[in-house]
Amino acid sequence: MARVKRGVIARARHKKILKLAKGYYGARSRVFRVAKQAVIKAGQYAYRDRRQRKRQFRALWIARINAGARVNGLSYSRLIAGLKKASIEIDRKVLADLAVNEKAAFAAIVEKAKAVLA
């Protein structure tokens, strides 16, 4: 059986990991063993945070909608209930944008929700 020398494959594997670890601090970007662990951990954080980002943005939108609703004399939960009763289907992302950038339009939507609730 012939001897297998893995020089090319090992170097390619190391290069790939070190390329992914580029920009990391200290040994994490230079030493293969440490870099490999850092890259794996970074991947785990990225995977987790892609899911958390969705939760965090939804929480931010709800906070903005709540603030805008309270300025117009309604709580967040009452506003959402009113919008559902009025069959107004605007998602929270758009509502939050209206609450921040288009206060008049948001106020009009809140008034429609109030009218249905009253």
Curated annotation (Swiss-Prot):
The keyword rRNA-binding applies. Pfam families: Ribosomal_L20. GO terms for biological process: ribosomal large subunit assembly; translation. Keywords: Ribonucleoprotein, Ribosomal protein, RNA-binding, rRNA-binding. GO terms for cellular component: ribonucleoprotein complex; ribosome. One of its GO terms (molecular function) is rRNA binding. Belongs to the bacterial ribosomal protein bL20 family. Binds directly to 23S ribosomal RNA and is necessary for the in vitro assembly process of the 50S ribosomal subunit. It is not involved in the protein synthesizing functions of that subunit. This is Large ribosomal subunit protein bL20. It comes from Ectopseudomonas mendocina (strain ymp) (Pseudomonas mendocina).
